[in-house]
Amino acid sequence: MIKGVGIDSIEVERVKKIIDKGDLFAKKVLTPNEFAQYQKLEGKRKVEYLGGRFSLKESFSKAMGTGLGKSVGFQDIETLWDDLGHPVMTSTKFDGNIFPSITHDNHEIITFVVLEEK
């Protein structure tokens, strides 16, 4: 049974400005595993990665019906790549199946998350 659906977007230019200020935001939003992947990236891929992970976490929290805050925090949600480069999302706050989707172009990063109860 579907528990929830969440969608979010963020402007690429906004993410670029955040990255230009240093790693403080990335360290707040990304788990240690995500941050390790992030540090290996450069340029456009770095922007897509940070913006995508932030937006996916927003989408997840919307699907949970909580938003980000006391109930669900950035460190409670992790999205890494599988062997084929697909996003695989896990969370300490949800025990069901999580289906993330992400797309981006030169202007916008859009994410979608479906939560399915076991």
UniProtKB/Swiss-Prot annotation:
Known cofactor(s): Mg(2+)
A GO term for molecular function: holo-[acyl-carrier-protein] synthase activity
EC number: 2.7.8.7
GO cellular component: cytoplasm
UniProt keyword terms in alphabetical order: Cytoplasm, Fatty acid biosynthesis, Fatty acid metabolism, Lipid biosynthesis, Lipid metabolism, Magnesium, Metal-binding, Transferase
Keyword Amino-acid biosynthesis: no
Protein encoded by which gene: acpS
Enzyme class at the top of the EC tree: transferase
High-level lineage: Bacteria, Bacillati, Bacillota, Bacilli, Lactobacillales
Protein family membership: Belongs to the P-Pant transferase superfamily. AcpS family.
Subcellular localization, as worded in the UniProt entry: Cytoplasm
UniProt name for this protein: Holo-[acyl-carrier-protein] synthase
Task performed by this protein: Transfers the 4'-phosphopantetheine moiety from coenzyme A to a Ser of acyl-carrier-protein.
rRNA processing listed as a keyword: no
Family annotation (Pfam families): ACPS
Residue positions binding Mg(2+): D8, E58
A GO BP entry: fatty acid biosynthetic process
Matching SUPFAM superfamilies: 4'-phosphopantetheinyl transferase (SSF56214)
NCBIfam families: acpS (TIGR00516), pantethn_trn (TIGR00556)
Reactions that this protein is recorded to catalyse: apo-[ACP] + CoA = holo-[ACP] + adenosine 3',5'-bisphosphate + H(+)
Alphabetical list of InterPro entries matching this protein: 4-PPantetheinyl_Trfase_dom, 4-PPantetheinyl_Trfase_dom_sf, ACPS, Ppantetheine-prot_Trfase_dom
